[in-house]
Amino acid sequence: MKTVTLPSGQTVPALGQGTWKMGERRDRRASEIAALRAGIEVGMKLIDTAEMYGDGAAETLVGEAIAGERDGVFLVSKAYPQNASRDQLRRACEASLKRLRTDRLDLYLLHWRGSVPLAETAEAMERLKASGHIRQWGVSNLDADDMDELIAAGGEGCATDQILYNLVRRGPERTLLPWLERHQISAMAYSPVEQGKLLRNPALGAIAARLEATPAQVALAWVMRRDRVVAIPKAGTVEHVLENRKAVDIALSVADFATLDASFPAPRTARPLEML
């Protein structure tokens, strides 16, 4: 499994598992748990969730899925911005830990920026780190100017920025990804196949056919081409998660990258960070 190195020096799988909208339907619960467990077995040991997902339902499902496997999983969750204050963040974290059936998070993120000052959130995160509730912390959906402000406000401990990034959302390549590279901060790409919407593209399909792969696998391989980017697709079935895993083994050629650049051109000017 390809890995990404965090600022701490710790390595994590370049291909993880997302959980948005998991745990919300009883008829899919067994399948979703089986998918997460299958992903762990094949090396996709980074699992990303959030208190927002199903109002905690995804965290509860993840807690069940990783029972007995906690030490082998890199567990990520995210806090609502309204819970990112000095007083609220500890309570939010402890509620997430209870749902996840664990005593610590490997990485805890601010889900998006709200009204709480970044300096206060950074301080609250460092307190959770000191108390052992979390091992590392980061942010999500923050653009380069936000990251500048975060670092200036005492947020040097930020380990990652989780962002919307895929073939049709290449805006981060203009400013944000270079900023993260300069500061040796990793990125996590959520919705790396745009919820399946980009998979009918003819160019993507042609490359997939030549490689005896699926368009989704090619799209994931494209995201993982960068050394500091972790892709976190969601898969609700064992079959789907095993299909995603094969993306790690795909080697795209220079010609493939050129074809994808022509079909999915990067923006020529900077644009605000998009989010879902």
Task: State what each model feature region is.
Residues 18-30, 77-87, 111:
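Active-site mouth loops of central-metabolism enzymes
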Residues 26-39, 85-100, 145-148:
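Short, acidic/polar
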Residues 97-116:
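Active-site groove signature of glycoside hydrolases
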